[in-house]
Each structure stands twice: as C-alpha cells, then as structure tokens.
C-alpha cells in the first residue's frame, strides 16, 4: 500500500477505542489483506503541530488499553497501568500517548477472528504476518490521523520488536525509541518454545485447522496449555521457586492426583487468557515473533542496526530467560544512537518490564528527553 500523509480520520476521545481504516495492506510476503482496521486509544491532547505523540506498543497478548479500568471493548484493566497520565512517565499534560492493537490481534484490529469481505471470519485464510507488517499497519493508521512523525516509540517484548522495526524502518517518522526486553532477531530458544506453544494449540481437535470461530467450539485446552508454557518463560526461576518451591496446592496431594502450587498457578494463568484472547491471534502473532529478524533484507543484523540514525534507550532485565541480557547488549553495541545498555534489576524475569514500573518509568523519561533533543536538532 502507499501510505498517505493526508489525514482522513480523527483520534478517539481519551481512553476510548477508535477504529482506523487503512485500506488494503500488502504484506512483506506479497500477500494482501483487504479492509484493514487498526484499533487505537489515546491519552493526552494532540498538539496543534501533531508532534507530541508517544506510541506505546504492546506485547503478544496485550492490546491498546495501556492504562485505566476495564470498560467497553477492553474487559481487563490497563496492562501497563500508570505509564501514561498527568505526572506519569508519559506525562499527558505534555505528551499524547497513542496505543494500537496490533495487526493480527483480537481487540478491534483486523485478525483471524475478524470478518473478511465474504462476511465470514478470516480463520485459516488469514495470512502469516511479520513484525514489519505490524509496524507498516501502525504507520498507516497514524498517517490516516495526520500524524506523520512521532516523538517516540516505546515497547517491550513483541512491543520492543515493533519499536525496533519502527526506528530501523521509519527513521524519518520517529525521533526516539525505547527498546525493552527484546533482541535483534528470534533465537533458537525462542523459536523452540514458541513453536511448541503453537503445536499445543493445533493439537487440540477443536482447532479445526483454524476455522473454529463459527462452530461453537474453540481450542481452549490447547490455548490454556500454550499459555502455561509461555508463562514459565515470562517469569524468573528464582521468583517462582521462592513463591512456590515444591509445595502442594493447599491440601491437595500430587501423589494422589492432586496438584502442586506452581501447577495451580499456571492453570490459573491459562484460564485467565481464555476470557480475553483468541487462539488464532495467538498463533499468528507467535509466528510473527518466530520470524522476527531486523536484518532480513537489510544486509544482516549488524548492517541494519549500524545504519539506524534514531536515538534509542535499550533496556534489559537481569533475570529475563526468554530475552537474556546478551540480546539487549547486542542492540546497545550496534545501534549508533544508544549510549549504553540500561539494566533493570529484577527477580520477575521477562515480565520485569511490566512489573518494575519505577525503573522502567525512568527509562521512558530518558527516551522522551532524547526525543526533545532530536526534535530541536531536526527543526
């Protein structure tokens, strides 16, 4: 698609969900998705120059609702509550925080559960997408709103991969970036754990080759199992052992068919996801993570990163076993606009980027300071 910078739509009211039509989208693979819609929320007021936007990018099972209580269209509270608002790291007395639901998601944006032109869910017909495709859709949605340059992009995990593709692929449209708990490409360990999650979903007979949306049956057992396995990679080993050790769940006896405490905890995590997420989106977005490689078509990782002119803050979590610190160190070493790796001490593993709000809030403030300085240089 050709991205037009002529505004055709407007931002929704603060905290409400708006659906932005971006038309047909040609993917990196060459496939085309027609009638793409991207869900958007915002906090803060857009400046007259439209130059104060901070784009907040969610991880795998997130959505556009970054802060605030549950409400229409967002059945759970904000996943990064407190990150945006008056006096918050993204201070909405100055900045306008904008969050999208990613292409392929299930909270308003076009994905496998959305209706195609024939009035039926996309299901198995929804094509594989890449992180790069997700960012192209976000850029198009913002352009439809008349936002041609953003102050900063901020994200962790899959959101960090999206932020990385923003600064590498669209350096003229972003002044600074915060890359949290992410790497330049998918590792063998990540692909191994993530393809196993996909296999769990597809092994569920109710998967029905991905065309389950109108059958009254969904691969709930497979999605629960995938989430349990994923959640283990999100939390820290020491944290889990400190909380649960080898304890039984209450009065249950594992030797007599009962459960361990950590087993009960993981089952609860799987159950929670079922109430708010679609298995088809889980598969599509996990495949996008598997194919993540900022160096693809750009001469390799080193060449792609060294060519990026955008100032960035790179942050990693000490106990992250899904995206270990060596991956952020590579980004910090190769991105010319990075002044060194920022390390967040945490026992919470990969989820530390969500839990350690004070430390991460300071990294956000540093990123917005870079955006200010870069904005002065570009004027």
UniProtKB/Swiss-Prot annotation:
Its EC number is 2.3.1.31. Keywords: Acyltransferase, Amino-acid biosynthesis, Cytoplasm, Methionine biosynthesis, Transferase. Residues 52-356 form the AB hydrolase-1 domain. Its main location: cytoplasm. It catalyses: L-homoserine + acetyl-CoA = O-acetyl-L-homoserine + CoA. SUPFAM superfamilies: alpha/beta-Hydrolases. It comes from Mycobacterium tuberculosis (strain ATCC 25618 / H37Rv). GO terms for cellular component: cytoplasm; plasma membrane. Belongs to the AB hydrolase superfamily. MetX family. The gene is metXA. It is found in: Cytoplasm. Homodimer. This is Homoserine O-acetyltransferase. Transfers an acetyl group from acetyl-CoA to L-homoserine, forming acetyl-L-homoserine. Substrate binds at residues 227, 351. The active site is at 157 (nucleophile), 320, 350. NCBIfam families: homoserO_Ac_trn, PRK00175.1. GO terms for molecular function: homoserine O-acetyltransferase activity. Pathway: Amino-acid biosynthesis; L-methionine biosynthesis via de novo pathway; O-acetyl-L-homoserine from L-homoserine: step 1/1. GO terms for biological process: methionine biosynthetic process.
């Amino acid at each position: 698609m050709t991205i037009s910078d002529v505004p055709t739509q407007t931002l929704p009211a603060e905290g409400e969900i708006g659906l932005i039509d971006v038309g047909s989208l040609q993917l990196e693979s060459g496939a085309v998705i027609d009638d793409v819609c991207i869900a958007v929320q915002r906090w803060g007021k857009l400046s007259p120059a439209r130059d104060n936007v901070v784009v907040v990018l969610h991880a795998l099972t997130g959505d556009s609702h970054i802060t605030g209580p549950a409400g229409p269209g967002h059945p759970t509270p904000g996943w990064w509550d407190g990150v945006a608002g008056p006096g918050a790291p993204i201070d909405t007395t100055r900045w306008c925080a904008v969050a999208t639901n990613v292409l392929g998601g299930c909270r308003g944006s076009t994905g496998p559960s959305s209706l195609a032109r024939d009035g039926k869910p996309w299901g198995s017909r929804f094509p594989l997408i890449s992180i790069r495709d997700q960012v192209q859709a976000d850029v198009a949605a913002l352009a439809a709103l008349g936002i041609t340059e953003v102050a900063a992009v901020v994200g962790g995990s899959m959101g960090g991969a999206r932020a990385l593709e923003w600064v590498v692929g669209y350096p003229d449209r972003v002044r600074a970036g915060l890359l949290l708990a992410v790497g330049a490409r998918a590792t063998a360990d990540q692909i191994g754990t993530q393809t196993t999650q996909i296999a769990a979903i597809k092994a569920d007979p109710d998967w029905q080759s991905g065309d389950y949306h109108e059958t009254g049956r969904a691969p709930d057992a497979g999605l629960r199992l995938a989430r349990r396995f994923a959640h283990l990679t999100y939390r820290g080993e020491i944290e889990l052992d400190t909380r649960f050790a080898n304890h039984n769940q209450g009065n249950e006896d594992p030797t007599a068919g009962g459960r361990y405490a950590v087993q009960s905890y993981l089952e609860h995590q799987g159950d929670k996801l079922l109430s708010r997420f679609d298995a088809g989106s889980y598969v599509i977005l996990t495949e996008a993570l598997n194919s993540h490689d900022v160096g693809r078509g750009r001469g390799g990782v080193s060449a792609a990163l060294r060519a990026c002119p955008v100032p960035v803050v790179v942050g990693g979590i000490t106990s992250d076993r899904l995206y270990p610190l060596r991956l952020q160190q590579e980004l910090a070493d190769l991105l010319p606009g990075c002044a060194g790796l920022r390390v967040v001490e945490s026992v919470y593993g990969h989820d530390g980027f969500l839990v350690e709000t004070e430390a991460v809030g300071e990294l956000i403030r540093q990123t917005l300071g870079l955006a200010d300085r870069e904005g002065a240089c570009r004027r």
